[in-house]
Each structure stands twice: as C-alpha cells, then as structure tokens.
C-alpha cells in the first residue's frame, strides 16, 4: 500500500495559489483577446473564440469593476438559501453572453499558467526539452504500423463528456489548489447553468457550454481525460508481466502544454477505487501486448489477447465512469472488433490491416516446392466521404460533392482568395501525405480548385470555366507545386513522380502538431 500511495502521490509543484488575484488584472484579458485574434497556441481560427471588434479596454475595466461588486457573493456561494442569488435580469454580468465570454477566456488563460513549460522549467530548475517541439501527430501512425500488425482485436472508445460541470471542477481541485479561483469557477458555472436552463434542456447544457467556451472547456475536459488515463496506467502497470523499475508510459496529450512521459497519479482516492472495484479482477489482465492511443476524445485500445480479455477491459472502463465519475455509460457504445476485418477511423485516416500474399519457389537439388507467405500491412486511406461532408459544412461544396462558390470570401482580393484555397489544399496534402492511395485526396483538391474558380467568377460576375482558362497553369501551381517540390527532394529521380510519388509512397511528417480543421469538422 505504501508503494501505491507513493505512485498516487499528488504533484505539489503545480499547485500555485496565486492565480485568483490575476483575474482582476487588465493584461490577462488583453492576453486572452490577443490569443483569440491570432488563434490559440494550436493555431485555431479566430472565429473559434468569438472575439470581435466590440472588445476594448473600457469594457475590460467595466467587467473588473462588476467582478469586484459581485465579489461578496463568492464568500456565500455555499449558503443554503441559494435562491437569493438567482437573478434572471439580463443585465447581470454573469448572464451577459459577452461578459461571460470574457470571463471564460480570462479564466482559461489563468488555469493554463501552471502548465506552461516555461513556468514549470523555472520552478524545477530544468530546461525545456527540445524534443517537445518534434512530437507530431504523424508519429502515431508508424507506431500503429509497427504494433498493430501482430494484434488481434481493436476497440474504438469515444470518451464521454461528464453530465455535470461540478465533476470537472472537483477534478481540477487536484491540479490547482487555489481555493478562491475554484470558488469563482464554481460560482460562474452555476450562474451560467441557471441562465441557460431557461433556454435549453439540462442534458444539452454542457454541450452548449463546450461550444461557447471552447478554451475553458477544453482545459477542464483534458483534466477529466487525464484522470481516466492515470487509472488506466495504474491498471496496466499492475497487470504487466515485467515489473521494470524504468517502466513508463507515453500518452499523447493534445491541447495540453506539457505532454507527460512518466506519469504520476494525482489522487489518493484512486486507492479506494482500485481496492473496491478492481482488486479482484487484476489477475485477468495478464496481457503484455496491450496498446492504447488517444487524441482528444477518441481512443483506440488494441490487444493480442482474446475477445474475453477485451470485454473485461471494456466493462472496467464502464465501471470507471460509473463509480468514479458518477455518470452512466452504456457498454454497447464501446465496440470490440477483430482487427483483420475492421477499419477504424482515427486522426483523419481510415486504418485497416491489409493482407499481402506471396508465393516463393524453393529449389533444393532435384526437388522444388512452393512456399506461400502472408504478411500484414497497415493501410491508411483518406476518408473521402467524411471530408466531403466537412467541405459541405463550411460551404465549399454540396453534400454530394458538387463544388460551389464561397460567398463570404467574395469580397477579398483575387490573390487572397487563391492563396486561401491554395493553403487549404497544401495543408490537406501535408496532413494526408501518409495515405496509401491518393486518388481520394485528388478528388478533394479538385473540389477546392473548382470552388476557388467559382468564387472568383462570383466576384467578377463571370463563369468558373472562364476563370479556369484565364488562370490556367498558374492556378494549378498554386495548389500543387509545393507538394511536388517536397516529394521531388525525397523520392528517387528515376521514378516518375506522377505514378510513384502520387499514388504509392506514404510520407509521415514530424511537424504536424494539430489535427486538420476539415478532419475536426467530420
């Protein structure tokens, strides 16, 4: 038990109780506004954060004054007579959508401070490892290609959202022990929920909050997901055949500043959970070939074990969410499939095992015989239907894939329109360069190219065919030249580019740190 307690010991280095006073500083909101205009650290578009020209220093000062005026509420939030705090006046600062957006973004900046690599390195007197900048999303696929070829079963897991925001606040208490800040967060979420309860049902409340306060919800959600992974790491470590002293796990942590390699448990309460719900079944998880990969809310669990073993892991996930996080999750939502007959969607690719059979003739003296061999290969394909659906959502084409103009871009200059469409094509080529077959990607590029021509034609009141003839190869170079130049440096000169590099060669890049926007829309 002492060893387990040491494994689950809290990390005190990140519990800095100095964040709440920063909520009353103007530069915090200026920083949040600047992040919103330029996109987040992960290069998200401006419209994600909902910032516009209405933000100003005067409004920030007015917000801080109102927070001061409402500050006396924080000391009595837990009072039994809560009805007196429920005001339905739209002018209340917590009910104002604009002010709540500012508070949400300012709070998101504050809670991210303890996880800044610069701050952590300052307190720990360590330099920031340069390898953190080299971790690419594409690095997951060579790992899958190396490991999945020898496994039997795979399970798609969609990590559910908690049904109540209070669960997320309780989890955050173990990461940041700034009591006033946590009280303010609880107060803010309570008021936000009461205001939206008149407009939406309680079941959709957390969904609406995640859409309107993406940055704050993303941090709270990642704290919750990390709890699931901490317990998963503990179970996997307990069930491992080899108890190495240097045993460690690497979990790809998206939307976190720090991607932790050697994890420590954050809650001593996990001891009780493990003892009460998992102690009697740990013996059944003796499987050295278990692999877990997650990005955002989608996880893949693969194993070389039996179907019964995968079912036991499945029900332990369900028990974890039911008994530890206190919300019901139906077991049928976790699908277990035989890897040889299944294609799973992960990180914008459809991945499956492709069996390649070959026959070798063996000659020994006067005798000869044939040897049939079967090898597995991980095939990664571009999900054309999903991408067309994403293009339809952002109005580049119809649901059936017919290109249309982009009216919202018609007011831009011609060069800006071409540059935007070209950048989208280059980003798609860059992200889906690991596809086994490129024909589907070429179809998406064709849709974008025609959409670009029709957007220009709409601006100049002409036809798309006219602009295609006018621009000719110039438009084609804007969409394809960069990819061709990159591949020409990598592939052998003797092999024709149009056949070998375009259709067969898979290339994984080491500089992709975020999922393509079209993949996120699908």
Swiss-Prot record:
Q: Which terms are listed as keywords in the entry?
A: Chloroplast, mRNA processing, Plastid, RNA-binding, tRNA processing
Q: Which superkingdom, per the lineage?
A: Eukaryota
Say if the entry is tagged with keyword Hydrolase: no
- Where is the protein localized? Plastid, Chloroplast
Q: Which GO terms describe its molecular function?
A: RNA binding
Instruction: Give the matching InterPro entries.
Output: Domain_X, Maturase_MatK, Maturase_MatK_N
Q: Name one GO biological process term.
A: tRNA processing
Gene Ontology terms: cellular component: chloroplast
**Classification via Pfam families:** Intron_maturas2 (PF01348), MatK_N (PF01824)
State the protein's purpose: Usually encoded in the trnK tRNA gene intron. Probably assists in splicing its own and other chloroplast group II introns.
Q: Which family does it belong to?
A: Belongs to the intron maturase 2 family. MatK subfamily.
Protein name in the entry: Maturase K
Q: Which organism is it from?
A: Iris tenax (Oregon iris)
Q: Which gene encodes it?
A: matK
């Amino acid at each position: 038990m002492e060893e387990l307690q040491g494994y689950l010991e809290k990390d005190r280095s990140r519990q800095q109780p100095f964040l709440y006073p920063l909520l009353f500083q103007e530069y915090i909101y200026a920083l949040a506004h600047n992040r919103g205009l330029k996109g987040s650290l992960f290069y998200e578009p401006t419209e994600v954060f909902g910032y516009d020209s209405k933000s100003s220093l005067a409004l920030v000062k007015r917000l801080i004054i109102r927070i001061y005026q409402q500050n006396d509420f924080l000391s009595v939030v837990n009072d039994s007579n809560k009805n007196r705090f429920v005001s339905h006046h739209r002018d209340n600062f917590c009910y104002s959508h604009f002010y709540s957006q500012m508070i949400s973004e300012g709070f998101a900046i504050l809670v991210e401070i303890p996880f800044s690599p610069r701050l952590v390195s300052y307190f720990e007197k360590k330099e920031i490892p340069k390898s953190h900048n080299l971790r690419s999303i594409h690095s997951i696929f060579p790992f899958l290609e190396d490991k999945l070829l020898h496994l039997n079963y795979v399970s798609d897991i969609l990590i559910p959202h908690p049904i109540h925001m209070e669960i997320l606040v309780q989890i955050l208490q173990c990461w940041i022990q700034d009591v006033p800040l946590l009280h303010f967060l609880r107060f803010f979420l309570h008021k936000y929920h009461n205001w939206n309860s008149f407009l939406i049902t309680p079941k959709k409340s957390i969904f609406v909050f995640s859409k309107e306060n993406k940055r704050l919800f993303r941090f709270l959600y990642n704290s919750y997901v990390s709890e699931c992974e901490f317990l998963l790491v503990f179970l996997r470590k307990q069930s491992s055949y080899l108890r190495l002293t240097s045993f460690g796990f690497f979990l790809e942590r998206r939307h976190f500043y720090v991607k932790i390699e050697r994890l420590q448990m954050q809650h001593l309460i996990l001891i009780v959970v493990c003892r009460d719900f998992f102690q009697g079944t740990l013996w059944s998880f003796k499987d050295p070939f278990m692999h877990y990969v997650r990005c955002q809310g989608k996880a893949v669990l693969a194993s070389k074990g039996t179907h019964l073993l995968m079912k036991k892991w499945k029900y332990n996930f369900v028990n974890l969410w039911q008994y530890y996080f206190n919300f019901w999750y139906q077991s049928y939502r976790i699908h277990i499939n035989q890897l040889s007959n299944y294609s799973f969607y992960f990180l914008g690719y459809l991945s499956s095992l492709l069996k390649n059979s070959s026959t070798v003739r063996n000659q020994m003296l006067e005798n000869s015989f044939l040897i049939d061999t079967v090898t597995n290969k991980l095939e990664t394909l571009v999900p054309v239907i999903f991408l067309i659906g994403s293009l339809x959502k952002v109005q580049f084409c119809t649901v059936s894939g017919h290109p249309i103009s982009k009216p919202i871009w018609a007011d831009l200059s011609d060069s800006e329109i071409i540059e935007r469409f070209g950048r989208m094509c280059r980003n798609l080529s860059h992200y889906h360069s690991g596809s086994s077959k490129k024909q589907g990607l070429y179809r998406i590029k064709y849709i974008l190219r025609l959409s670009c021509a029709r957007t220009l034609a709409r601006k100049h009141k002409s036809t798309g065919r006219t602009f295609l003839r006018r621009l000719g190869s110039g438009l084609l170079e804007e969409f394809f030249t960069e990819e061709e130049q990159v591949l020409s440096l990598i592939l052998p000169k003797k092999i024709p580019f149009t056949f070998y590099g375009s259709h067969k060669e898979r290339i994984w890049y080491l500089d992709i740190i975020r999922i393509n926007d079209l993949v996120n829309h699908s």
